Every structure is written in C-alpha cells, then in structure tokens.
Amino acid sequence: MKLIFNETKSSQPDPFIFEDNGTFYLYVTANAGVEAYESKTLTGEWIYKGAVTAFEDAHDFCAPSVIKLEDKYYMYVSCVANNNFQYMHVACADSPLGPFKNEKCLYDQFSIDSHMVKTNDGLFLWYAKNNLEHDLVGTRIYVDRFIDPYTPENNPKEVLLPEFDEEKFTPQCTEEGDWYTLEGPFWFKEGDWQYLMYSAGCYQDDTYHIGYAIAKTDEQDLKKVDFKKVKNGNKFSPVIIKNSFEEGTGHHSVIKVDNEYYAVYHARDYQNTNSDEYVERRTARICRLSVNDGVITAERFENHI
C-alpha cells in the first residue's frame, strides 16, 4: 500500500521510519538535503516538512537513518561533499525535524545505507561499502562498533556476501565484469532471533528485492554474530519483490507498532515508457510483516495493510 502524502509531486526513495513520543517521522533521499515527513498514524496523511539537514557544501543526500540517544537525535547519511562521493556522515539535532548539523565524516571511502542500533554491548552501525578483492566484486554489508555516536572503531566486519545472479547490479559498473550489490541493511531482534534484512540487485531491475539473514543468539556484540542468509534451496528467496501492482521494490526500514511489524519500502508504479532515460518514480509503501521463529513473510496489498 502506498503511504498517503499531502505533497504529491515528490518521490520518497530509501524511506526510514522513526517514532518518537507518539509521532512518526519518515526520512528520505533527496538532492539538497534529507527530506522529512510527519504523521500521527502509519496509514494516515503524512505532512511534508522539507529538508532537515544543515550541512555546508553538500548534496545528493542518500539513505538516512536516525537514532535517539539521551534526548539527542543522530542522523547517519551519505552525501557528496568535498568531491567525495557518498561518504557516510553523522549529524546531531535537538528535534526529530532537525536541523541536523555539526556533521562529521565517518569513513574516508564510499559508505552508504546506514542503520545505527544500540544493544546492551554498545552502539553498532550497519552499512554498505565496496569490496574489490573477491570473485564477486561489488557492494557488501558490514557492521562496525562505535565508541560514541561520532566515533567509529574503524574495524568493520563483513557480514553478508553476494551469491546469486539476482544480486547483480546492471548495467555493469566495471569493465572487467559483473558488479554485485547487497545494501540497505536493517537489523532487529525478536524473541530468540536476530534478523538482518537487506536489499539486493539494481533498483532499476526486475530482480531488485528485499531479503534477510538470521541468527539464533542472544549475543549483544553484533560483530560476533554470524548471520545466515535465508535461501530457497540454492536459490534466492526474496521477502519483497515486484508483483502485479508495483516494481522496483527495495530499500526499506522496519517498525513495530502495537505488537505488529511493518516494513516501509520504496517501489514504483508500472508505467509504459519508450525512453531509456531514468525518471525518479520511487515512492514510499508499507506492508505488514509476519515475524515468527526465524521466518519473515510480507503481507502486501495495493490499497490496505
């Protein structure tokens, strides 16, 4: 189901949902600064609040996430700044609607798709970066411990690797061969299980999808957890992929409300076009998730959840 917005001309790529004091916030990718929406209910009208970042000389803000720590709000987001392409930054605000400022660059390389989480063992940042030293080169999912919200340990662990043709990013990104993409990690724990959801493939392709990995453990040091990708035998096993009413389904976040899990993700309506030029049509959607004993299934409907 599409989310309902009071401002209908915009797209909402890479949506991250966040709840604070009974209000829901949605943060999305945008060129001039991370854009935000606000709503009192998941399926009611979302009000456009504009750009909430206050970075200097930066653009192409991608895939933000937000965490609240001791009455401060921290946003982790990649952007283009100082001729550095999509390096991960952190910024702080006193309100969920910003302005997020006092930014700091966290890594000196391409690093995208954050999800900062806190366990009893500390802060851990899930994100994606490139690995060129493998048979299947491309973007992988990593986790790094943080000393404080601004300071990574800078010793990330590679967690998920590509395995399937459906995880290729096309058109090819290298002259040498195929490029594989795992990105958009989102971690949560339910019962005895830890879940690591992710996006795979190219957002313009039919095979772009959301999958997940699992670990049955109470381990709080997330760098010590060994996640196993959920597969259908030797084939990929998407939780969310294109269906009869939407395509381009990917990059998501998860929220638990009234003991029910929901995924908020972007997708596109089907559209007949003869042009090869990409037009941004990704909009935020929502579906209910069933999460039970290491298994996630999605319940998707076109006009309700």
Predicted regions and their residues:
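Carbohydrate-active catalytic/glycan-binding domains of CAZyme proteins
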Residues: 1-305
